[in-house]
Amino acid sequence: MEKLEQIVNEIEQLTVAELAELVKMLEDKFGVSASAPVMAMPVAGAAAGGGAAAEEKTEFDVVLKSFGAKKINVIKVVREITGLGLKEAKDLVEKAGTPDAVIKQGVNKDEAEEIKKKLEEAGAEVELK
């Protein structure tokens, strides 16, 4: 039990980018996926209408594509959104354009749009995946 608590304490110390990398490493190591399984639900209108209905995505990752000309403003907003320290937020912002530049993972559409709006107002270019 003490060993598990120690592992949890170590994980708490990681930054968002480090956590994302840890998840990728665990997925590769054990051949699993950390994403929640999606259950296929029959759509009543699709069978009757004969058309395929596109399933709307419910969880989004907010990815920083570019921090633009106002890097300091973007760092401030990233700190506000993530709760990271100054150095961690700066490191995350400087990873803009890479797969590690995930600001938030698995958020609902409204929250993702709100985060995107805040970052774009600060001068960043953001993508929702």
Curated annotation (Swiss-Prot):
Keywords: Ribonucleoprotein, Ribosomal protein. The keyword Flavoprotein does not apply. One of its GO terms (biological process) is translation. CDD domains: Ribosomal_L7_L12. Gene3D superfamilies: 3.30.1390.10, Single helix bin (1.20.5.710). InterPro entries: Ribosomal_bL12 (IPR000206), Ribosomal_bL12_C (IPR013823), Ribosomal_bL12_C/ClpS-like (IPR014719), Ribosomal_bL12_oligo (IPR008932), Ribosomal_bL12_oligo_N_sf (IPR036235). Transmembrane segments: none annotated. One of its GO terms (molecular function) is structural constituent of ribosome. GO terms for cellular component: cytosolic large ribosomal subunit. PANTHER family: 39S RIBOSOMAL PROTEIN L12, LARGE RIBOSOMAL SUBUNIT PROTEIN BL12M. Homodimer. Part of the ribosomal stalk of the 50S ribosomal subunit. Forms a multimeric L10(L12)X complex, where L10 forms an elongated spine to which 2 to 4 L12 dimers bind in a sequential fashion. Binds GTP-bound translation factors. Forms part of the ribosomal stalk which helps the ribosome interact with GTP-bound translation factors. Is thus essential for accurate translation. Belongs to the bacterial ribosomal protein bL12 family. This is Large ribosomal subunit protein bL12. It comes from Thermosipho melanesiensis (strain DSM 12029 / CIP 104789 / BI429). The lineage of its organism: Bacteria, Thermotogati, Thermotogota, Thermotogae, Thermotogales.
